Structure formats: structure tokens, C-alpha cells
Amino acid sequence: MKRPIIIALDFPTAERALAFLDQFPADLHVTVKIGMELFYAAGPSIVTDVQARGHAVFLDLKLHDIPNTVESAMRVIGRLGVTYTTVHAAGGHVMLSAAKRGLVAGAMAAGVTAPKLLAITQLTSTNQAILNQDQQIMGTVRASVVHYAKLARASDCDGVICSAQEVQAIHTAVGADFLGITPGIRPASAQSDDQQRVMTPAAAAKAGSNGLVIGRPITQAAEPVQAYRDIMTEWSN
């Protein structure tokens, strides 16, 4: 899918995650995000189980370590056949470049397409106070995000994870072909939960987002499949 809605499978066990996915018709193939909790609980087999159902996987482990360690880990991830994976832009140019090398090498060894490498800029839970006081980064959140996007582009990443509020600034700075995948998306009727920088699907589409990550408004809906379809309609229109 060119502009996917990525369902965040924020479940503690494989059984619950797969039971959720089994509510979707067999001919409705979606993209799902497997994050730290589910991957650490279930291991790589959860990726295979999701793919066996025809769904694409965004493996969101947010790697951030020394370059050699990240390259080795990404070599393993590259063999899994996932569509997207993540690394922290704060790790710097050498680490980001090592991540890309690892992904490409792993995918080539397995004979699969290399995942898109997405760099985490600032989490959508980061506000101005956290940026300035906790991280000791002076300036605005937007300036920090754009800086990390430029770094990611120069380091052969395929895109970034960012708030929809910053997508236009990123595309202006580094080009519209650089992916801006955006969490912090909530339908107008939903609460923002622990997200600080949120936007509706329709507003994110107008802002130029290349994909949306949505969890609770779908996974905790009374009718998840209908919730997904409703959000897809809003996003597509």
C-alpha cells in the first residue's frame, strides 16, 4: 500500500495479537506495527505468524547502540522480510549508516526485499519542556525534528517517524520523496492519551503524511475492522 494505515499491535502476548488480527477478513491485508512489548514477549515467530496471514510488518524496535551492534542487529532484522523498521536518529550518522548496511546485507542473504529504514526524530510524547529541560536541546521541537530528518537523509535512511505537524517542514527541508510516517493520530472523537502532538487522519493527509500509525482507536474499538475502514476512508479522502 502506497500510504498505509499501520495498526499498532500493542498487545502483551502473541495470542492476543493474533486473535485481534483474526477478526479481519482473509482478503483484507493490512500493515501492522510490532513494537518492543510484543516482540520481546513472542520473539521473531510473531513476525512469521503475522506474515502468514498476509499482513505486512513494521518492526518498531527503535535501535540505539554503538554502530557495530546496530549493524549486526539490523542484519538479523533484514532477514525477516519486514516492510519497515526503526532506529534512533540521535545515534548519529555513523550508526544510521551502519544500520542501513546491516539491513541491506541481511535482506540480500535471505533473498528478500530490504526493509525501509525509518529514523526516530522526536517521540510524539516529547513537548517543549522535555526537549529543553530533560534532553538539554535548546530550540523548538520542530527544529530538532527537521535537524534529525536532514541527518537521516544524509545517512541513507528512507524516512523518519515524526508528528504530522512536522511533515511539511521535513518535506521542504529534505524532499517530498523522503517518507514521513506519523504516529499520534487520533480520530476527532478519540482522546489523545499520552501523546502530546496529535492530529486527525484527515489533517495528517493534508499535511502530507506518507503513512499513519494508529493503535488504540482501532485495537480498543468495539468493532476494530469497521474502525479501521472508517479511518481508512477519512485518510484516503
Curated annotation (Swiss-Prot):
SMART domains according to UniProt: OMPdecase
UniProt KW keywords: Decarboxylase, Lyase, Pyrimidine biosynthesis
Active site: 62
Gene3D superfamilies xrefs: Aldolase class I
Pathway given in the UniProt record: Pyrimidine metabolism; UMP biosynthesis via de novo pathway; UMP from orotate: step 2/2
Keyword flag Lyase: yes
GO biological processes: 'de novo' pyrimidine nucleobase biosynthetic process; 'de novo' UMP biosynthetic process
Assembly description: Homodimer.
Free-text function comment from the UniProt entry: Catalyzes the decarboxylation of orotidine 5'-monophosphate (OMP) to uridine 5'-monophosphate (UMP).
Name of the protein this chain belongs to: Orotidine 5'-phosphate decarboxylase
Organism in which the protein naturally occurs: Lactiplantibacillus plantarum (strain ATCC BAA-793 / NCIMB 8826 / WCFS1)
Taxonomic path: Bacteria, Bacillati, Bacillota, Bacilli, Lactobacillales
